[in-house]
Amino acid sequence: MRIVFQGDSITDAGRDRRNYFDMGNGYPKYVSEMLKKEFPNAELELINLGISGNRTCQLFDRLYPDAIALEPDVISILIGINDIWHRHDVDRIETTNEQIAVNYRAILTRLRNRTQAKIVMLAPYILD
């Protein structure tokens, strides 16, 4: 089973980007450790493709070269923190709530149309 983690710095979590099997120190690492412990005989391929600083529009742009092309069984996405957080930076372009919703729908639509993967969409905790 191939599981791909996509997102921003919360997913990236300091991973070594030269090695996409490096889980970093965030939730992908803990999920990976739990899965390996719970299913020790399962053939798991766990890939972290989080990129620190990414926004929803950037994740959308890299869905094919990153996640879809890998033909994962499961895609876990946690994105949106930077869309919200950077509203407070004077020199950043603001992403409205409406645009974030449009981007989320576009991400889900592209994944549903281009892959058979199960999608696990995690809400940015700042939105909960």
Positions of predicted regions on the chain:
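Alpha-helical cap/lid subdomain in secreted, periplasmic
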Residues: 30-45, 58-128
